[in-house]
Amino acid sequence: MLVVLLGPSCSGKSTFQKELVENEGYHAVRTATTRPKRVGEDLSSYYFLKDQSFAEWEVRGDLLCVETFRGWRYGVPRDEITRRGGRPNRVVILTPGGVMELLSRHPDIITADALSILYLGVDGATGEARACKRGDSRREYLRRMAADSIDFRHYPRENCVWEFTPDYILDCINNPQNYKLKPRLKRVERKRK
């Protein structure tokens, strides 16, 4: 099974991914980026590549769902997302654009696997508290919210038309341990296709 997590900044995607890895035996799909490692960031969270290496991976077709954000490039290594090995269940964090690319341009990955798309939502107060806790400045949090308002303009709100339908929409739950994946997934709302 391939689980795709998406949601705005500070919605708990990384925390939920960590829970799936540690408690459910999932493999965390490691993405590639040209941005530098943040202070205190674990080297295993990304493949940190120089611009030239990233471009070479992209030209070879080794990267999927490539996007640019604030001048830094991000992509998903094909072998990471298709890896099955000893941990057949994988979890990846994608942007809405990444999900659209996965659905429209990579049917080989989708048909070879069960695919679940989970949208994690967050309210403003909780998101801001989480950003502060992880050391983001208020300015950085507001910048992220502005970017999210563009990236997620088609996502959960009343009478919304979705570009794609997530399998589950999880409301903001302050305790990430309340998030569980199938069959123990807390099913908050199911959107009909």
Where are these regions (language model features)?
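Hydrophobic anchor at the beta1->P-loop junction of P-loop NTPases
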Residues: L5
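Walker A/P-loop
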Residues: S14
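Conserved phosphate-donor/acceptor-positioning beta-strand/loop module used by diverse small-molecule
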Residues: N89-P96, I109-C132
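ATP-dependent small-molecule kinase phosphotransfer cores
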Residues: T33-R90, L94-G98
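Post-Walker A helix-loop "phosphate-sensing" segment adjacent to the P-loop in P-loop NTPases
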Residues: E22-R30
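Small-molecule kinase domains that catalyze NTP-dependent phosphoryl transfer to phosphate-bearing small molecules
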Residues: C132-K193
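ATP-binding Walker
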Residues: S11
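P-loop (Walker A) phosphate-binding loop of NTP-binding proteins
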Residues: P8
